[in-house]
């Protein structure tokens, strides 16, 4: 049987740099192939070639789809062939309805007049196909991210898709939304629709794939059956070396209590009747890694936003640092107390995309370079920037490059560099490795371990339970705004954490860390 897709010896250069070099990829109808590689490995470039974003003639090699060579000059050319790509940043218009988004650019008309009755009927069938029980007239901006992702798939199905490319589709989804999405991909597979799945979440890659293709430094490293590969096998192919332990387990000692929070309650910014955090108390020691686990909506981010002074609603409770009660109502007061935070959404809250990498790093510590006068000491600032880039291994062609052009992992390292310039005693990391590749994750994990060895206390909030369990000395489990468990991490399992989240009573382990 001929392949649905064959990409033969694809090479794409930018100036003298080969982004992809002689890469081959092929798949059958109904096959799910995961494309794996670190950020900057060439995955996105290869997909842009396939979709016509990089037009025929701008690359070397040949693309055969459904038995015909594709020579696309625009993404619309490949869409007409049945190839659709859904990016991590969804391409939906939030102010339009579900129906209007699905048919945008593909409206059904009769004599120049749009046939809304026929489009509504078609839209209802498409929504049913992706298991969405919503009205076609629903405004897309009112949907959750998981539902928006499914609307994107319905939009692709409306274009008679034969090959669906999903780029980091679950980066912002809950575990339940992820499960629904994977089930729908499997259902599409039964209808002969092929899928190229791009994700840094290797458990998903293993669960969904028939075949795994690995690219490293722009070159095709290998394609193997998913059933015969372990996560360690994938990592080794991706990074070119064996990571003996993803989570460094260097011994570190904890000191005295540095932080204590008592009876923290936070209300919804608009609806004062809704408690987002409900009577939460906990402590933190010097040199301790405290993980906070829970489902989306558990109140984890709201809790640490109160601690950092950026929760937009009202809250009450007591915060003690070094045994003394402190009042923190903004981030400047938090920083003055030795607290720094890497926010959950780095693109929205963590970086200024058009600003240089170096300026993003020094943004919160400009007082270090003024010497009591208003004029910046440019030489001192540049020296600090270069040292930070080297220390955190930020990969950038220049400190003056706009940070928005860096990979997610390197943006995150730059944000960490900014935090470390503040000389924090308490470092809060909210989803520290979301959407970044395995190599960058490993470097961040090593950095966290180095920081606690220096006595810095670290709070880690993560939706990935293996990450929480792999890093933490102790785990707080939250559910619906309440602290349900405070557990010493003596070989804790994911099942124990989820059981603690869902049980009715509060559970605390009294052992010392």
Swiss-Prot record:
Its EC number is 7.5.2.10. GO terms for biological process: D-ribose transmembrane transport; D-xylose metabolic process; D-xylose transmembrane transport. Keywords: ATP-binding, Cell inner membrane, Cell membrane, Membrane, Nucleotide-binding, Repeat, Sugar transport, Translocase, Transport. The keyword NAD does not apply. It catalyses: D-xylose(out) + ATP + H2O = D-xylose(in) + ADP + phosphate + H(+). GO terms for cellular component: ATP-binding cassette (ABC) transporter complex, substrate-binding subunit-containing; membrane. Its main location: membrane. Residues 5-242, 259-505 form the ABC transporter domain. The keyword Nucleotide-binding applies. One of its GO terms (molecular function) is ABC-type D-xylose transporter activity. It is a peripheral membrane protein. Pfam families: ABC_tran. ATP binds at residues 37-44. It is an enzyme of class 7 (translocase). It is found in: Cell inner membrane. InterPro entries: AAA+_ATPase, ABC_carbohydrate_import_ATPase, ABC_transporter-like_ATP-bd, ABC_transporter-like_CS, ABC_transptr_XylG, P-loop_NTPase. The complex is composed of two ATP-binding proteins (XylG), two transmembrane proteins (XylH) and a solute-binding protein (XylF). Part of the ABC transporter complex XylFGH involved in xylose import. Responsible for energy coupling to the transport system. The XylFGH system can also transport ribose in absence of xylose. Belongs to the ABC transporter superfamily. Xylose importer (TC 3.A.1.2.4) family. This is Xylose import ATP-binding protein XylG. The gene is xylG.
